[in-house]
Amino acid sequence: MRRLGVNIDHIATVRNARGEIHPDPLNAAIFVKKVGADLITIHLREDRRHINDIDAKKICSIKGLLVNLEISTNENMIKKALKIKPNFVCIVPENRKEITTEGGLDLKKNKSKLKKIINKFKNKNIRTSLFINPTISDIIISKSLN
């Protein structure tokens, strides 16, 4: 049973703000695994604001560490995720001007698209979750998507 998951996005945010190579998200992932984390969460944003492609690939290759990769519904992001093969994918809404994720996916508008995306991950044995609003209707729609 998983007991501790750690989001390490802001390790990369600090690195990128400094314009340097440290702190390194890979080292952070290795460290939190060593001290007992069961899972690492990273968000590979379209604008690569924090975690970048190289970070994601390296972190997903750590043996014995489960990785939850947050991505948007952008086709390029879906392809990247299928290529690096995290254990889990969480599909999140993304707005370039937001500081952090501001709300859930628009499930009614994107139901068909989400179903196709979920099936792509399912076919590769990648478990998928959705970042949703806490409403009964979104819970019902999520369940219908599998």
Regions found by a protein language model. Give the residues of each.
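Conserved anion-binding
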Residues: 76-77, 84-146
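Conserved N-terminal beta1-alpha1 strand-loop-helix module at the mouth
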Residues: 1-86, 144
